[in-house]
Amino acid sequence: MADNILLAKRFGCAVCPLKQVKNEHPNMQPTGTDTPVLYFLGEAPGLDEDKYNKQFRGQAGQRLRADLYTFIQPDDADKYIRWNNIVRCRPHDGKANRTPTSIEIECCKQSVYNDIEKTKPLVVVGFGGVPLKAITEGINIGIWVNRFIPVKFGEHKCWYYSCYHPSFLIRQGNSYTTEYDRYFKICLKNVFDFVTKNYEEPAIIEDGHTDNISILYTFDDVIKALDSLKSEELVAFDLETDSLRPFEGGKILTIALSTYDRTYAFPIYNYWKDEDFKKIKDKLYELFLSGGGFIAHNLKFELEWLYDMFDLRLLMEGKWHDTMVQAYLIDERTTKVKAKADGMFKLNILTYLNFGFKLKELSNINIKNITSSRIADILLYNGMDAKYTYLLFKKQNKRLDKSLKICYNNLIETTITLTKAQSKGIIIDLDCVDKYIEKYTAELQDLSEKIHNLDEVKKFEDMTKKVFNPLSPEHIVYVFEKVLNIPPKVLTKKKNYSTNDFVLGEFAKDGYKIAEYITAYRKTNKLKSTYLDNVKELANNGVLKPVYNLLYTQTGRLSSGKDSNA
């Protein structure tokens, strides 16, 4: 596959599989203006486009044009917009359209890039995941819809703006149509507002990523650098650690501090003489309490390590900032849980969104096993993290209006409080835990005996040659449907026999003891497995240290989660 991709990049149309596919208008050329403000980029021509030799003429194209014409007159559209597809021949299987392959995309996209460079639009508006993947090399469309990404085609810098493909809206059917329709129109409005009211030149940092990063290996250099930062109004900092949390032997490997124009990175763990390390710690402590503001990306993570290294005073008296909190507030999506899961608020993605490069691609280290990397590589990566955290803070801070800054300050205070709560932990009465484990274990054994003494369960085991599992929906369905011959009361979304708690409750009302016992077994097992079984393992020396989350909860309320290092 890799060799085929290289051939496709080099020879283009000459080696494209679509050359062998019969089409009425192969190699369809762009239409619209030669001096576009907007460059509309689709996936590939469909049946109607191939027939009429013009982009966006099928059902999806008509849908797009209908919404588009609420913002611009039909006669004016081609004066400001250029229309093209990332693949210029219709991909199909002889009957229906299909998604173009990666080889077909590689064969065609350079000619599209050349056209964008030549016509110099302000914004390339991409519809669907295919053009997005081609231009950004694999980013998921779900997190990039309604996002402006700074990109470069040859020597031309512009923005890439991602929209859902109109055919996606058509496929959703009635259940989603209203919401997706609304959002699609919002996206189109946003791109028109951007070019007519709010346009700014794309900022792409192409080189110099490691400029002004000083790697410090001597005691005198570290002390001098720390002293020089005391007068700074703002300093970004970043820690590289060997684990997620500072418990059970976790270590800070390196630290970096940056004002963007100068960045210092130096080792922490297992490098200095004891007396020198104590002096470095004292200088760091003085610096963090010197009166300036200190910026982190994911402040709660960094503060938990600093609390472990220093004390509570540092948390409570330091002046802290968080670029992740900024990004969270700037992001207008209501479902931010999904955005976090997709990595939308990671520094690597935010540098791409704001500065046009992916930070991880500049590093030689293995993030998942950082201790396997050379210390020099870790320090350089650490320095870049701090450097671009500083720059990101400056840029995002301009986007926080007065009301968002109030929210921001409140979230910073909450972050400090949650860090304190996490670090101090919750004292657990382990003797009490043991008593409850013993109690629920006995209850489960009693219920299990009652269940396995039922005639229908014995018949199940005779028929299937399996031991009945009261937590298995498959086993429960078999007993009700094939042993007891009871029709379903409720079907699941997939039209299967439901055995949820409501259904079992109804069966229990009908006098079926198996339903009553299984319901009780489920409840008791959940109490034991969820709240007791892992407590002794997680409660180090009788203290449980949960992870508290505030930014990315579904309901907006505080949630918590366990951590393998807790």
PLM features: residue spans?
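A short acidic-Thr-Gly-centered motif at the start of a beta-strand
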Residues: 28-33, 153-154, 217-233, 283-288
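Metal-dependent phosphoesterase core characteristic of DEDDh/y 3'-5' exonuclease domains
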Residues: 136-146, 160, 164-170, 258-260, ...
